[in-house]
Structure formats: structure tokens, C-alpha cells
Amino acid sequence: MLIDNKIISVLTIKDYKKSLDLAKCLYDSGIINLDIRLRTQQSKKAIELIKNSKFKFNIGIGTVLSLEDLYFVKSLGIKYAYSPNTDVKILNNANKLDIQFIPGISNIDNVISAVKYNCKYLKYYPAEKSGGVSNLDLIIAKSKIKNLKFIAMGGITSINIKPYLMHKNIIGIGTSWIAEESLIESSNWKEIRKRASVLLES
């Protein structure tokens, strides 16, 4: 599902005009996997620009909370999407639309709901606030389901990423630390490149 490495840059873009400069910065830094959130009015325009750019990213769309969001994902030909929860209506429709949906889980009940809808991957979110890898181990043990695969997101930075990188059930780590909103808004591409390098070398 992920390309080249486990790092996913989670992006909240408020000004779509910065999209291509941001894309170039990340791509040149070795960041290929993106989770672009549908959190702002200009998110969709930003996603379209990056998707249709010369940069060959592996794009997932985050904060998918409605059927309208799902149809947007489908319209762009994007194969997977994230949500912060396990909304049954969204899970059911994602299956019908052949979208690889990655719902947010933080406890065993969430896992059971997601597995019923054939979710291959689960988003462990918010990872740090939920108790980090220790809590994830408890969830895995309680589930009694073999080969659960997770993408961890929420509060992960260069300081605490190591346990997530080493965990055998975690196939990807999403972080907004690489390109925080303030860095994007101020066009601080130098700092974004620096942070990308730090995580890719972790």
C-alpha cells in the first residue's frame, strides 16, 4: 500500500496556491506517501492540483466523514481514504465504491466493527493520546485476530517515532509534524525538507 518507506506526510492545506510548491518540496525530500485532509474549504482544490501534478505521489485522502467525501475520492481515482472513526455508513459505501477505507480505531470495539467490513488496514488514532504502542499491543491481544495491520497517526514526531517504526503490525506512520500548518502557511520549505530528512533517516 505504501511506497518506498513507512512515512506518510499528513497535510492540512488552507491555501491551495501553495499546493504545488509544497508538493515539490516534499517530493524532492523523498516523501512519496501523503494523507491530504479534507479539513479546509480549499482542500479539494489542493488535492486536485497535487494529484494532477508531475509529482508521482501515493495519495490517500483523510478526514473522510460523509458520502460526498467518498464520491470525491472516487471521482479522482484515488484508491484509499482515512477517517478518524468507524462510521458504519461510510464503511459500507466505501466497499461498494471499491475504495480501500482505513477507519480510525482506538479500542477493541472499533477493531471489531472495522473487520466486519473487510478493512485490511486500520488507522490507530490518536496514537499517542490513546497510549502509544503499549495500548496498541493490548488491542491486538484482545482482538485475537492474526495479522492486523495498522497505520499509526496522531501526535507522532521525531521524538517518539521509533517504537512505531519498530512495531511489526504497523505498516505506516502518519505525521503532520513534517509539514505543520504554520510551516505551509509561511512557505518554510527549508524546515519542511529538514524535518522530512530527519524522519526518513530514523
What is each residue range found by the language model?
Residues 6-11, 34-36, 59-62, 81-82, ...:
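Hydrophobic faces of well-ordered beta-strands that scaffold small-molecule active sites
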Residues 50, 94, 139-142:
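Hydrophobic positions in alpha-helices of CheY-like receiver
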Residues 71, 90-94, 111-116, 132-137, ...:
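Short, charged, surface-exposed secondary-structure boundary motifs
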Residues 80, 84-90, 123-133, 169-188:
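Glycine-rich phosphate-binding active-site loops on the catalytic face of alpha/beta enzymes
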Residues 118-123, 134-136, 141, 146-148:
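A contiguous pocket-lining binding segment that forms or flanks enzyme active sites
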Residues 139, 147, 158-164, 169, ...:
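C-terminal output/effector regions of signal-responsive regulators
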